[in-house]
């Protein structure tokens, strides 16, 4: 179930978001379908990433598989994830060599940024768990948003909400642990105006 099936839109949206919604017939139709449960939300299968494959949903949404995150290959990887990884390491976040990930460029009227999703298996016991790390970085040839907000939630509640009032001062990231049956939804807000809802992992 999505939150639209248990709550009214005005309980979930700000006045500004509600105004944007009402001015866009496609969004109104989408909210109606989500609230009535008349369509299935696409699900990104990050388990495929462990085998260096992208599922059809991820491909359609513009996700690009990253090369192995082993340190030896990381140095030659283009983009800014190596910088993000260094900053995460300095904050005590260690990404294991067996981790796999993908990125997706998100753009809006005033600029754009890159969303990285990294996952790895924590345990393969009778109740296996996996880690999902979401990090936001700059996108080549795009103006980075001045402010960013990142929310990760499961089917019932927000799990992590992080905000960065000045993207020049650091990076925004969140990590959650789940079992194989859990799904996580990602919402990113750029400059308090552009809202990106990422289909669940």
Regions found by a protein language model. Give the residues of each.
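C-terminal, beta-strand-rich globular interaction domains
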Residues: 93-201
């Amino acid at each position: 179930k999505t939150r639209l099936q248990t709550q009214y839109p005005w309980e979930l949206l700000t006045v500004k978001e509600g105004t944007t919604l009402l001015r866009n017939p496609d969004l109104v139709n989408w909210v109606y379908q989500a609230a009535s449960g008349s369509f299935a939300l696409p699900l990104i299968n990050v388990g495929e990433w462990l085998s260096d494959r992208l599922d059809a949903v991820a491909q359609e949404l513009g996700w690009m598989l990253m090369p192995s995150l082993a340190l030896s290959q990381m140095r030659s990887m283009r983009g800014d994830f190596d910088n993000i990884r260094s900053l995460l390491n300095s904050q005590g976040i260690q990404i294991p060599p067996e981790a796999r990930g993908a990125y997706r460029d998100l753009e809006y009227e005033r600029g754009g940024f890159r969303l990285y999703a990294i996952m790895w298996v924590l345990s393969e016991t009778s109740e296996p768990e996996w880690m999902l790390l979401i990090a936001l970085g700059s996108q080549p040839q795009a103006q980075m948003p001045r402010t960013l907000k990142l929310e990760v939630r499961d089917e019932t509640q927000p799990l992590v909400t992080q905000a960065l009032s000045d993207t020049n001062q650091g990076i925004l990231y969140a990590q959650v642990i789940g079992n194989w049956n859990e799904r996580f939804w990602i919402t990113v807000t750029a400059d308090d105006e552009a809202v990106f809802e990422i289909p669940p992992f």
